[in-house]
């Protein structure tokens, strides 16, 4: 069984949606295994723009099965709207959608807590209840999709959780609590009724299915709850570390997989937290406008900066990457010079590693190498012969620094705007 894992190698928003859409056509199954509706994967098909928050991107292909695995936290209301939105555009996915019965639910009270926590701490959350949903999961107070099969048990769990949240709201935040248990109960059961035929035992599913599987990571390695810029991270393992517990399959299952990292030709970040190569002046604004750097989930402007190769090599080590896709190369087309960060300076010492300590990360200063810009459009290029030498030199420098081949370049948002550079992935995925 052929397996491909696609992972974000930066702080998310690397363009994974397009790459998954492009490659998943040649797979039988696509799987989302962590995160929730805080992710936003954007795909442009026949000039139509799709933004998927919960559904695997590959499900846009009519022969591909889509899996929402147990590592995700699922907002059934969002899922309902997403499926209906696709149906209105002539894309029907219900018959090909499989949802783990072990996946936890995002409830209205999680969103309430998210907004209260954000007011208090302000880490730049999407306010979609993802963090509190994971908090309840690991605090053993979560409600799983399988719990909705027993309506009496579901009501009891809901009652207990609402009492818990009410105390937090009133006694900790001095805020009014006005969520109605019966309304939540009825809404969740109504959504469950819509999707109950899609709910499966995922362990049995993986052990009985034949065919190739593409695993679609959400967010990015530097937002991983364990390996990212903690505490300014997401609440799940957004790196390869999340694969086994997110799917329920043992590590051995992934031993023959190809691990593909997706990275922009520069760096962006949404929300708060350390960002060593951030550009706050005209150059940062230029990157933002040329790259259209506004969040697909929140609409917030993204912080922009030069490519951070120290962080990118760290992502290689965390994930065991076999190859890279570099996206948005065309955004750099008009720059006279292009800088890449090759080391950090920390308290007068030059270091070549990505620190775990928050207090160190906010103190590091980037050490740059300046490369010559290409001053020629690469937008929409579909063959390597169309690329200027300086652009290829830029790609080669990334390969030499990270030790990982760049197998593909994305040169625009459309499905056909890409260039294969290496055959290593192309032959494995059957893509031509």
Curated annotation (Swiss-Prot):
Highest taxon of the lineage: Bacteria
Location relative to the cell: Cytoplasm
Cited PROSITE patterns: ADENYLOSUCCIN_SYN_1, ADENYLOSUCCIN_SYN_2
Protein name: Adenylosuccinate synthetase
Active site residues per record: 13 (proton acceptor), 41 (proton donor)
Family per similarity comment: Belongs to the adenylosuccinate synthetase family.
Known partners and oligomeric status: Homodimer.
Keyword annotations: Cytoplasm, GTP-binding, Ligase, Magnesium, Metal-binding, Nucleotide-binding, Purine biosynthesis
Coiled-coil regions listed in the entry: none
Residues where Mg(2+) binds: 13, 40
């Amino acid at each position: 069984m052929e397996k491909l894992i696609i992972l974000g190698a930066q702080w998310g928003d690397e363009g994974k949606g397009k790459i998954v859409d492009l490659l998943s056509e040649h797979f039988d199954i696509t799987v989302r295994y962590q995160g929730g509706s805080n992710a936003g994967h954007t795909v442009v098909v026949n000039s139509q723009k799709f933004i998927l928050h919960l559904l695997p991107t590959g499900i846009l292909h009519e022969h591909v099965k889509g899996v929402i695995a147990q590592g995700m936290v699922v907002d059934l209301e969002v899922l309902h709207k997403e499926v209906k939105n696709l149906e209105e555009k002539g894309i029907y996915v219900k018959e090909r959608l499989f949802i783990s019965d072990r996946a936890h639910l995002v409830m209205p009270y999680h969103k309430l807590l998210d907004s209260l926590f954000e007011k208090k701490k302000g880490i730049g959350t999407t306010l979609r209840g993802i963090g509190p949903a994971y908090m309840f999961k690991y605090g053993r107070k979560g409600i799983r999709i399988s719990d909705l099969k027993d309506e009496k048990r579901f009501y009891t769990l809901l009652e207990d959780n609402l009492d818990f949240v009410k105390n937090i709201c009133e006694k900790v935040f001095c805020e009014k609590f006005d969520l109605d248990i019966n309304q939540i109960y009825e809404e969740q059961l109504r959504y469950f009724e819509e999707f109950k035929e899609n709910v499966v035992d995922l362990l049995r599913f993986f052990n009985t299915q034949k065919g190739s599987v593409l695993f679609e990571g959400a967010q990015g390695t530097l937002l991983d709850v364990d390996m990212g810029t903690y505490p300014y991270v997401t609440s799940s393992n957004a790196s390869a570390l999340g694969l086994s517990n997110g799917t329920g399959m043992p590590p051995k299952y992934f031993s023959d997989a190809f691990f593909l990292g997706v990275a922009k030709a520069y760096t962006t970040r949404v929300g708060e937290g350390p960002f060593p190569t951030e550009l706050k002046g005209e150059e940062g604004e230029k990157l933002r406008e040329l790259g259209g750097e506004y969040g697909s989930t929140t609409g917030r402007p993204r912080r922009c900066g030069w490519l951070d190769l120290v962080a990118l090599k760290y992502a290689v080590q965390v994930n065991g990457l076999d190859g890279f896709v570099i996206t948005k190369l065309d955004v750099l087309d008009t720059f006279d010079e292009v800088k890449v960060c090759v080391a950090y300076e920390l308290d007068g010492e030059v270091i070549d590693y990505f620190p775990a300590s928050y207090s160190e990360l906010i103190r590091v200063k980037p050490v740059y190498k300046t490369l010559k810009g290409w001053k020629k459009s690469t937008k929409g290029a579909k063959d390597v012969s169309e690329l200027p030498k300086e652009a290829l030199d830029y790609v080669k420098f990334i390969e030499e620094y990270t030790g990982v081949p760049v197998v593909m370049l994305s040169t625009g948002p459309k499905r056909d705007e890409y260039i294969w550079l290496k055959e290593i992935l192309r032959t494995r995925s059957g893509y031509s």
